[in-house]
């Protein structure tokens, strides 16, 4: 049987107190809507329709290529939101999943089980329910004397007895598609909210003797709908625990999972060790047997096997096998370290490529440079690559030795096996195998110190 999906992503999310549409708020580095769409994609959906409304164009811009959408111009309730998908779905034969775009914790496995249960029960509607420790705010599942689902009552419409019920509606359903769209033509706004409730179709089905099933969630956390920043933080914490658990069972050591923040798209190889207070974001790849020490931050980068990142920041950069950085180094966007490169403490590199075995041990800035193999940078070296308007490139060939406190005024080229003397200001190209000296000659004025303010006598 064909499977379809309607993802509700039209709401403003007033309680978020944000200019950003609610479904675009991120959990573990990815929007809530993206999490939901990923889970939906795991159950072989024939047609997926996203209902957009508030800031529709911003939401549409984030959708995967080819995703169908419908704009809900007026937000008149969940029933209305589903009904406007009729032109795309009403004539289809099959079962339709309806799910909110602000439920980032629900998994593809759960949605697959929900479809299986729906088909096994031969139901017209199947509700994903959960037993809530505190059901306040949720719609309640009302069952009859035979324990069959009778209806769903929203919090604002519930009486005292109904409010005491702990089985809640998670807001995720599967319906027989044609029955759903037929029933949606019969719902009204006769309720406390003055809206078209999707849940009213349950009573319509029940009155004509159709089967209503309820599948209870094993993990209540999956039911979390995010309506404010508090719930957003809860979703973040739960997602982080899931992510960290998955990495650990796959052979990654997390010294302190409670302070380790790893986004959902990060890949990490076995035998890697990650210490406390580490953040790894975006589309980051980390190979095998990598050490990442306390306080490091890595974003949208590639760190290959046998590397070390010690108390450092790595952004949009690539570290090849056996390279190491830190402590307190900063690889800025566009940096590429070849194999066995060493970048030490208080070194900043931007938009540069360093060849195999090159070393920049301390207090160095390298920007917009192409550096060969086994080049050594002495402490205090900088490439002066910016004239206030334009950036300029520096080329340094294999085996060059850059003396401490050298200032390299780009653009220029330093040749193979060349050496710059300590303290030099390099303003011209340096040929292969040349020694460059770009500093004033030292002069010692004997006895002059006695006339200086610092002098304290013999």
Swiss-Prot record:
Q: Can you name the source organism?
A: Lactococcus lactis subsp. cremoris (strain MG1363)
Tell me where on the tree of life, at the top rank, the source sits. Answer: Bacteria
Tell me the cofactor note: Binds 1 Mg(2+) ion per subunit.
Q: What is the lineage of its organism?
A: Bacteria, Bacillati, Bacillota, Bacilli, Lactobacillales
Cited PANTHER family: BIFUNCTIONAL PROTEIN GLMU (PTHR43584:SF3), NUCLEOTIDYL TRANSFERASE (PTHR43584)
Necessary cofactors? Mg(2+)
Q: Where is this region: Linker?
A: 230-250
Quote the record's binding site residues for acetyl-CoA. Answer: 379, 404, 422, 439
The name this protein goes by in its record:
Bifunctional protein GlmU
